A protein has these predicted regions:
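Juxtamembrane "helix-exit" motif on the non-cytosolic side of transmembrane helices
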Residues: 26-32
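Cytosolic regulatory regions of ion transport systems
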Residues: 1-20, 32-42, 50, 56-526, ...
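Surface-exposed intrinsically disordered loops and tails
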Residues: 539-569, 573-581, 586
Length: 622
């Protein structure tokens, strides 16, 4: 996009030059026959300035020129050409002047932004998502820059964003101009995701060689829906830069599963129905496959949609592990929507958690209403009302769907459809959600808990957090672990909240030997399922010896390049296997993490700057 903007600027300059040349040429017959060569050139150049400034005194010159032309037709054509040039040349000159002044103005803004010590936020592009994120920053004391946006019209910028700086340079070029000591946030959030990745890698290359005192002040957020991009970023030498890969669909699904836990709507059997298998439901399928791993619960996932065979094949290629007997996932690919409804009626009548995502927001709303009526009719007493979560992106349709949630929210209609929308840009693209969400804060605490477990003592928190920033794969694993904490608490009839309460309980009072084992099994099953949804597969002892000897695993028992891990196995087999491979029972790590949940929620390391109180909630058996 930046290259195209530069090309557009060059075209304007070239066009202006052509107009100047055309105006000069068309007056050559007059000035060069009236004056000698030198005076003719100077007079014609002076005349160009008169044209640009719209000097009315040159009107008499037209009459003199036309009078000197004998042919009336040629004279009329000549006058038309003069008129076009005398209109277009001043207009284009004024446009060029405004562009130059605007560029100078934005450069002055950039200079003062560089002198101020307040945080700086730089976006790679001005688009719907970056604009929504920018709005959430407007009330903070910061400077905001949109790269690659200077040639956009001022009218494209909303009134409440007038103090935002627009620059025509790329985000990497702007980065060179700023002091290295201030907190700087780069958001690579272009519509072209390949371009976003390119900008991210350029920024990493620039800052990875900076001093270690500089790198912690640099925060790079790369937005992409492609999971493989994180592998590319992890392979770059990024020092201790704070780099995060933001997957919009993953954020939406994690937020949904955290706000509306699977356990809330099930007593012992979790049955999730996914209507359709597009990108958002594929991400949901992966997350639910590990999120629903709970000792004492069974998990069943049903996916029904029109012609989903190709999507299923892609999923089987990228995550073959979830197609094994350990998982109960059924796919119903139908020829039309009527067949989909028939399949749901026949095989999914006991579903207690439903996610719908159609080809458009309208289709999603329509399908959700059909499913609501269907599930009511499946029960002779019309009491079957599982929650239906609708993926709605458009803000206006999102709000309309919210009115269908309960009768109380839409009293004029007095009708309850119990549809719960998710996916609005206004909900997800905020600074708080992206940077400091509860899940993100807890994931850092999970990382610090692991650091303590594997160091057998006190840790250097700053160095530990730097290690958190190095690999995206570790951050994704920690986020999944943080999300699952709520589910583990639900097994005990507990939950957590950030609100102050006098009803808080102490988790350690609930820890018995049986409870610790139950939660440890749940943690191992969650970890194993998470790896399999990421494409990992089990490896035998022979596999471990082979890739250890080859050097591809760098001596480790697992191999990230091959995505093979020997501990993808039942919990009961883990003790003997880990003793043989490592000489110790690795199940202890699961138990130690469970023991540290109070430290994670209590913000032992003072990273989250908030504490999560543990409270009682209605148990599933009550």
């Amino acid at each position: 996009m930046y290259f195209l903007k530069k090309q557009g600027t060059l075209r304007i300059v070239a066009l202006l030059g052509c107009l100047f040349a055309a105006t000069y040429i068309i007056y050559i017959p007059y000035y060069h026959t009236t004056y000698n060569l030198l005076m003719g050139i100077l007079s014609n150049i002076l005349h160009l300035f008169q044209v640009v400034t719209i000097d009315t005194n040159i009107a008499d010159l037209y009459d003199e020129i036309v009078a000197g032309i004998g042919n009336t037709v040629i004279a009329n054509i000549y006058v038309i050409l003069l008129g076009i040039l005398h209109i277009s040349l001043p207009a284009l000159s004024a446009l060029t002047a405004v562009t130059i002044l605007f560029r100078c103005f934005s450069s002055v803004q950039l200079f003062f932004a560089n002198q101020r010590k307040r945080p700086l936020y730089i976006f790679s592009e001005l688009n719907e998502r970056s604009l929504q994120l920018c709005k959430s920053l407007m009330e903070t004391n910061c400077d905001i820059i949109f790269a690659g946006s200077e040639s956009d019209s001022f009218s494209n910028k909303p009134d409440n964003l007038r103090r935002v700086i627009l620059k025509d340079e790329s985000i990497a070029e702007i980065a060179v101009k700023f002091r290295k000591s201030k907190e700087t946030y780069f958001f690579c959030i272009s519509e072209d995701e390949d371009e976003s990745l390119s900008y991210c890698l350029q920024l990493i290359e620039k800052y990875a060689t900076e001093k270690e005192t500089v790198q912690p002040h640099i925060h790079i957020y790369q937005f992409s829906r492609h999971q493989d991009f994180s592998v590319i970023i992890d392979s770059a030498d990024n020092g201790c830069l704070d780099i995060r890969c933001i997957n919009e669909y993953e954020m939406l699904v994690y937020d949904l599963l955290d706000t509306y836990p699977l356990t809330r709507y099930a007593k012992s059997d979790i049955h999730v129905l996914l209507h359709g298998l597009n990108e958002i439901n594929t991400v949901a399928l992966r997350a639910i496959a590990w999120c629903g791993q709970l000792s004492g619960f069974s998990l069943k996932i049903s996916v029904a949609g029109v012609n989903i065979e190709d999507k299923v094949s892609e999923l089987k290629l990228s995550a073959p592990g979830i197609f094994t007997d350990r998982y109960c996932i059924n796919f119903y690919s139908c020829q039309n929507e009527n067949e989909v409804i028939d399949a749901i009626s026949k095989y999914c009548a006991d579903a207690n958690y439903i996610i719908t995502s159609g080809q458009s927001d309208n289709a999603t709303m329509q399908e959700s209403l059909i499913l609501r009526r269907l599930f009511y009719k499946l029960d002779p007493e019309y009491q079957n009302c599982p929650p239906i979560f609708c993926y709605i992106k458009d803000p206006s349709k999102f709000n309309i769907t919210k009115n269908l949630t309960t009768a109380e929210s839409n009293p004029k209609r007095k009708v309850s459809y119990d549809l719960i929308p998710f996916g609005s840009l206004e909900d997800i693209y905020t600074y708080e959600k992206l940077v400091n969400s509860d899940l993100e804060l807890l994931s850092r605490n999970v990382h610090l808990a692991y650091e303590e477990i594997f160091s057998d003592g006190a840790i250097n928190i700053e160095e530990a957090l730097n290690r958190y920033s190095i690999f995206e794969v570790n951050k994704r694993s920690n986020r999944a672990n943080a999300l699952h904490i709520r589910y583990k608490l639900n097994l005990l009839g507990l939950d957590y909240t950030t609100e102050d309460t006098d009803q808080a309980v102490t988790l350690k009072d609930y820890y018995t030997e049986d409870v610790l084992k139950q939660l440890s099994i749940s943690e191992h099953d969650r970890w194993m399922a998470f790896l399999e949804t990421e494409g990992w597969v089990p490896s035998s002892k022979e596999d471990v010896l082979a890739y250890r000897n080859s050097g591809i695993s760098r001596g480790r028992h697992n191999c990230p390049v091959l995505k093979m891990h020997p501990y993808i196995c039942e919990y009961e087999k883990l003790e003997a296997l880990s003793l043989e491979l490592e000489g110790k029972d690795t199940r202890v790590y699961d138990t130690e993490l469970i023991v540290k949940i109070p430290d994670i929620l209590g913000d032992k390391w003072n990273i989250a700057k908030k504490k999560f109180n543990i409270i009682k909630v209605p148990h599933r058996d009550t």
